[in-house]
């Protein structure tokens, strides 16, 4: 029996909120974002007017929001988020790097399922450096949006076993593109690689590197043309286009 009064998670400053998925394969779908704090990477290259330190999820840096499962459930009830999930909104678990807390997350989702008598649709946003527990797919039918960091963003040591796993389960691979050289790197490391990743084009999404609506307008067409040339998917940053820099929308 899971003690929901004692088990905890660390959440970012924006906690949980309802919105539309803004990026990748599930773009436009109703989603309840659960943003966890803490990350195992330091992204140095994603610099824009809105993220000068290089991270596009800087709200996940705080580790002060330690909440019990009961506190999270109450917050979700107060915000109407449980009802959203019951009608098939996606539970988008993001960060930071959510797999850092996956032991607790497995308990949390199991407790949520028992308490409210349904299992939510789950999609993770992950950097692809930590192996997910097999239970996520086998028991919960979770999907994954993988966003590997390129040289532009600090290029952490590759984890081919993790990336091969995601390629095999047909995860969405989303790459932030800032220049043409990024595409050569993607093809060398992930498509025509010698480590067995060998991504298929239809599982790849190119997304512009930007932090505001104005920046998006400037660079999106170029990245879209790259996607056309390489026969891969293009993902805008829908939240920037609709709401610019606003949070919790």
What name fits each language-model region?
Residues 99-249:
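Conserved AdoMet/S-adenosylmethionine-binding subsite of the radical SAM
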Residues 33, 90-92, 172-174:
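Short aromatic/hydrophobic contact patches that present stacked aromatics
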Residues 7-8, 30-32, 202, 230:
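A generic secondary-structure signal marking the coil-to-beta-strand transition
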Residues 3-16, 30, 41, 45-142:
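Conserved Radical SAM active-site core
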Residues 23, 52, 163-165:
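Short, flexible, solvent-exposed loop/turn segments with mixed acidic/basic and small polar residues
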Residues 13-14, 21-31, 37:
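S-adenosyl-L-methionine
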Residues 24-27, 44-47, 247:
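Short, glycine/acidic-enriched capping/hinge loops at junctions between secondary-structure elements
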């Amino acid at each position: 029996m899971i003690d929901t009064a004692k088990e905890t998670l660390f959440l970012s400053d924006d906690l949980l909120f309802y919105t539309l998925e803004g990026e990748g394969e599930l773009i436009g779908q109703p989603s309840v974002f659960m943003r966890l704090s803490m990350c195992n990477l330091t992204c140095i290259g994603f610099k824009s007017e809105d993220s000068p330190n290089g991270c596009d999820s800087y709200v996940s840096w705080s580790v002060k929001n330690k909440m019990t499962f009961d506190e999270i459930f109450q917050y979700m009830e107060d915000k109407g988020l449980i009802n959203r999930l019951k009608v098939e909104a996606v539970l988008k678990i993001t960060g930071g790097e959510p797999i850092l807390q996956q032991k607790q997350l497995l308990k949390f989702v199991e407790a949520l399922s028992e308490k409210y008598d349904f299992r939510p649709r789950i999609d993770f946003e992950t950097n692809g450096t930590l192996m997910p527990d097999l239970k996520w797919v086998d028991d919960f039918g979770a999907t994954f949006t993988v966003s590997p960091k390129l040289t532009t963003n600090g290029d952490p040591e590759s984890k081919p076993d993790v990336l091969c796993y995601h390629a095999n389960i047909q995860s969405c691979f989303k790459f932030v593109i800032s220049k043409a050289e990024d595409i050569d790197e993607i093809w060398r490391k992930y498509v025509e690689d010698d480590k067995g990743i060998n991504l298929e084009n239809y599982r790849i999404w190119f997304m512009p590197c930007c932090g505001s609506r104005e920046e998006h307008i400037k660079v999106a067409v170029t990245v879209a043309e790259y996607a056309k040339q390489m026969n891969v998917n293009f993902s805008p940053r829908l939240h920037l286009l609709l709401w610019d820099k606003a949070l919790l929308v």
